[in-house]
């Protein structure tokens, strides 16, 4: 079973590596990111003094709109990647992060709560989770869709009686993703 899961992870990373490595020849999805939220991430990354200041006004965004109207949390992991990395690097790290979590989340959900036990069903779970992880979507709010199977897995674990700190931490961390 471990070989099947590791094969799925290797295929996922090979798929992501084709798109984003090497960086000078990257073929990241073709979109006009200037019309979306990515320009807000870039402007926010160049600001200082905005942390937990809900009235912080940015002149470069919609002619002086307060930063809190953009819907960006100061604790959002994905948005804060743009503070520490260049925009392309932050985008690539975010893609690897939320697609990996999406793969693991759906794999755990299918393996533990949906499919019966057995190596054949692990193969079905890995291939379905791999399909889910590489699904094409526009990641404006980072992993909101791809994190849901992991959240649902944690809720089902608590509901079934195997309450662990890990499950509670996943539920608490979900709004910050």
List each model region and its residues.
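Membrane-interface coil-to-helix junctions
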Residues: 11-106, 131, 142-144
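Charged/polar, solvent-exposed surface patches and flexible loops
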Residues: 8, 79, 157
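Membrane-embedded helix bundles of polyisoprenyl
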Residues: 103-109, 119-159, 164-177
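N-terminal membrane topogenic signal
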Residues: 1-6, 116-119, 163-165
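Alpha-helical transmembrane segments of integral membrane proteins
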Residues: 4, 92-96, 119-126
């Amino acid at each position: 079973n471990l070989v099947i899961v590791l094969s799925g992870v290797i295929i996922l990373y090979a798929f992501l590596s084709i798109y984003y490595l090497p960086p000078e020849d990257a073929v990241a999805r073709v979109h006009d990111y200037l019309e979306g939220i990515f320009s807000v991430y870039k402007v926010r990354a160049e600001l200082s003094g905005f942390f937990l200041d809900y009235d912080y006004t940015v002149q470069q965004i919609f002619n002086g709109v307060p930063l809190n109207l953009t819907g960006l949390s100061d604790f959002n992991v994905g948005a804060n990647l743009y503070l520490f990395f260049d925009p392309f690097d932050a985008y690539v790290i975010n893609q690897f992060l939320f697609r990996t979590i999406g793969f693991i989340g759906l794999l755990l959900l299918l393996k533990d709560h949906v499919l019966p036990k057995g190596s054949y069903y692990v193969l079905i779970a890995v291939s379905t989770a791999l399909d889910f992880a590489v699904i094409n979507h526009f990641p404006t709010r980072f992993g909101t869709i791809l994190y849901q199977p992991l959240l649902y897995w944690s809720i089902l674990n608590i509901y079934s009686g195997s309450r662990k700190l890990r499950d509670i931490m996943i539920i608490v961390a979900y709004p910050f993703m």
